């Protein structure tokens, strides 16, 4: 068995884990990131594309914000559609200047990978059977397998940034862990298309047929969602059926300007609200979706 020494082991190589590793490095704290998937798989995942003000500032603090600031689009407001009307909410005005930024999570992850590479950060991919140990002892450790060889990393702290289904939260004893969850009786059918967005700012639409969202990734890449029953399957929805239903849920003036096209990604996301406590057990800390999920 190969043994490694570090200050922090981070389980999960998504945005949360990579950003934490980068922030720790800038404070002189060493870390090892363990990710069970390949880098190509992580960078191929389609995820959210709107970044909150606080996260944008963290990216800058981590020294990873240059491309984000150059290519991302700042939005100072959004629209709410209801009863055929479209009302704009001035986000900057009502928050003292805070805004959101449209910049895909895939690009965030790519920027974080490049930053860790530039600083010779240790990110281990295809780490299988990851398991934290000795969480309440002074020197916890994590074991995993890579290419059939057993590995061990001893550390001061372990961070579980391995998502809702990860091993970290499950390592907290059941008599300590409390979970609060609400599963909603519907999902969001999402389509990604290489078409100009119908609006420069997001549109949240309330309609008797169900919710709809008009979002974007760039000026030539759009992301749209409609609320569907959990019993629906992706194959139940052709592109034509999706566009037709989306138009029904939008005000006429918006629907008239909607440019449709072939989907390049289509999926149904079930929605849940979830919070786990405590977020710390011994020397294990939970971060990101391992600790809490807010739909969508």
Listing of model-derived features with the role each one plays in the protein:
Residues 4-8:
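Extreme N-terminal starter segment of soluble prokaryotic enzymes
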Residues 11-26, 30, 112, 159, ...:
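Conserved mid-domain beta->alpha element of the FAD-binding
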Residues 25-46:
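Glycine-rich FAD pyrophosphate-binding loop
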Residues 29, 64, 121:
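Short phosphate-binding/catalytic loops that engage adenosine nucleotides
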Residues 37, 164, 290-291:
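Conserved Walker B
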Residues 41, 162-163, 294-295:
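Glycine-rich, N-terminal phosphate-binding loop of Rossmann-like dinucleotide-binding domains
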Residues 44-48, 52-117:
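Active-site-adjacent segment of FAD-dependent monooxygenases/related oxidoreductases
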Residues 114, 121-271, 275-280:
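Conserved FAD-binding catalytic core of PHBH/FMO-like flavoproteins
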């Amino acid at each position: 068995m190969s043994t490694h020494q570090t200050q922090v082991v981070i389980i999960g190589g998504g945005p949360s884990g990579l950003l934490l590793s980068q922030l720790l490095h800038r404070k002189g704290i060493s870390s090892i990131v363990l990710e069970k998937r390949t880098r190509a798989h992580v960078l191929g995942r389609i995820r959210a594309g709107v970044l909150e003000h606080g996260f944008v500032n963290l990216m800058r603090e981590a020294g990873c914000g240059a491309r984000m600031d150059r290519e991302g689009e700042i939005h100072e407001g959004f629209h709410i559609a209801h009863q055929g009307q479209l009302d704009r909410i001035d986000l900057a005005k009502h928050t003292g200047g805070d805004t959101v930024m449209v910049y895909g999570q895939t690009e965030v992850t790519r920027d974080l990978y490049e930053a860790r590479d530039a600083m010779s950060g240790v990110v281990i991919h295809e780490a299988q059977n990851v398991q934290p140990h000795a969480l309440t002892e002074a020197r916890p450790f994590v074991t995993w397998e890579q290419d059939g060889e057993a590995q061990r990393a001893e550390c001061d702290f372990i961070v579980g940034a391995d998502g809702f289904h990860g091993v970290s939260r499950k390592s907290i004893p059941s008599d300590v862990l409390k979970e609060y969850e609400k599963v909603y009786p519907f999902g969001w059918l999402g389509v990604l298309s290489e078409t100009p967005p119908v609006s420069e700012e997001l549109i949240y639409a309330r309609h008797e047929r169900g919710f709809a969202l008009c979002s974007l990734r760039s000026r030539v890449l759009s992301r749209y969602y409609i609320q569907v029953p959990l019993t629906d399957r992706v194959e139940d929805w052709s592109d034509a059926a999706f566009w037709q239903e989306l138009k029904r849920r939008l005000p006429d003036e918006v629907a008239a300007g909607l440019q449709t096209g072939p989907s390049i990604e289509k999926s149904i996301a079930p929605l849940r609200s979830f919070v786990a406590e405590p977020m710390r057990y011994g020397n294990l800390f939970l971060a990101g979706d391992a600790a809490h999920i807010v739909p969508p």
